[in-house]
Amino acid sequence: MYSLARRLQRIPPYPFVVLAQKVQDLQARGVDVIRMDIGAPDMPPLKPVIEALKSFVQRPDVHRYPGYKGTAELKVAFADYYHRRFGVILDPERQVLPLLGSKEGLHHLTLAFVNPGDIVLVPDPCYPTYRTAALLAGGEVYALPLKEENEFLPDLEHIPRGILQKARLLWLNYPNNPTGAVATLAFFEKAVALARRWNLLLCHDAPYTDVTYDGYVAPSVLQIPGAAEVAVEFNSLSKSHNMAGWRVGVALGNEEAIAGLLRMKSNVDSGIFLPIQHAAAVALRQIERDWILKRNAIYARRRDLILETMDAIGVKTRRPQGALYVWAHVPAGFSGDEFADWVLTKAGVSFAPGSMYGSEGRDYVRISLGVPTDRVEEAMQRVRKLIIGGS
């Protein structure tokens, strides 16, 4: 018998793997499941991006190992994008590191800087990787509750001194997954000040900065003067450019964090396929605000369809200004797990139970906007029929 390493025994199976198995079991029985649990765009990238990949992959010299640091073209494209979008100036060589999707970067950064027994400050609810990365590194997680009455922002002013003395990383994520909440520059100023005072590495996961609604424009933590002295920001082309399957992300900011992350990554992977790096650079150069606004308008329409249905069935929701989700408080008498399982089993609609994201999510479900609009309409009709019809 082979036993798992103790580090792996500290963490549960990735929650979406478990949910996907439930869905597959239903599909195997012929159930038409509408998957509103997956946080990925359903729309394609810009056509020039696909054409760039098709053209570049024909070259005979692009199939070698790509190098560990990323191509100069891609690093400059990321730096230029941050300058255009946020007014932030970054050194492409020392402050920009392309990633095989930001998820691996979140893990590798944690492994690079967290020792056994160190504390990692993690929002609750949150993207599960922040928590599991800390546990795999031997760290301890200190949860920062995200409460609706506090706009789903963590209370940074009342973290116990003893916790801060032992903490190494502070994770933030705005626009937020799963709540759809947003943060202001004033909030980021407080976070940067806290990181500076307690020698924390502030890690801001920001893949949804270009997925926003109702005129809201999301900031970068790196816009705060001096933030790059204490902060690293993770971004991705997955949500902003509809390229989730391409696996292109980036870490930007603090030079020590970038160097440590590179040292870890270079011992684990061998970089991003060169044609994908070239196409990603094209995406960063060619993306236009009009394209983003049109895409986000489609998401906003889906959001509103979901909000209308949730209101009709008596489910409490907040109108998200960013990210790809509606965070819905489930009806009385249900936990989030129970409600999600009931809707999946009875209506064939898959929501993500809020408990996947932490104990503060136990009374919520996360509903994704990354589903074609006609399927959103059908899913909401099924949910209305199930609940209002009393089935």
Give the ranges of each region predicted by the language model.
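N-terminal small-domain helix-loop-helix segment of the aminotransferase-like
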Residues: 2-101, 108, 286-287, 387-391
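Helix C-cap/helix->beta junction micro-motif
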Residues: 29, 137, 197-198, 313, ...
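Conserved glycine-rich beta-strand-loop-beta hairpin in the small C-terminal domain of fold type I
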Residues: 281, 297-307, 317-329, 361
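Conserved PLP-anchoring active-site segment centered on the Schiff-base-forming lysine
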Residues: 112-134
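Conserved core segment of the aminotransferase class I/II
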Residues: 224-297, 308, 386-387
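PLP-dependent enzyme catalytic core of the Aspartate aminotransferase-like
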Residues: 333, 342-352, 357-391
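Active-site phosphate-binding strand-loop segment of PLP-dependent enzymes
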Residues: 142, 146-215
